[in-house]
Every structure is written in structure tokens, then in C-alpha cells.
């Protein structure tokens, strides 16, 4: 997810997206541990998206 897209989301949407991405990330990690997935770069992309959203949430709490 792009940083500009994240900035345009509301706080509730950010929380919902964070929960959704964390669940997807854990599902893919488990699937990858059992048998390798086709695109392992998807794991890195999801992990970074989770970090971007968590950072935006923290940034908004400070303001």
C-alpha cells in the first residue's frame, strides 16, 4: 500500500486495514512454512505494509 493511500484513510479504516493485513500476513507465513509459496516477496510486502500502517497510526496518536 502506498504512503499516500494510507494518509487518506481515516483512523477506523487504518485499524481495520491493520487487522486485515496482520491476519493475511500470519496466514501466508504459516502457508509458507508448510510448503513454499509461489511469490515469497509477498511476505516482505505485507510485513512492510503492516509497518507503514502501524507507523501512521502512531504518528496520528502523537499529534
UniProtKB/Swiss-Prot annotation:
GO terms for molecular function: structural constituent of ribosome. It comes from the Bacteria. SUPFAM superfamilies: Ribosomal protein L29 (L29p). The keyword Metal-binding does not apply. Gene3D superfamilies: 1.10.287.310. The keyword Ribonucleoprotein applies. NCBIfam families: L29. Belongs to the universal ribosomal protein uL29 family. This is Large ribosomal subunit protein uL29.
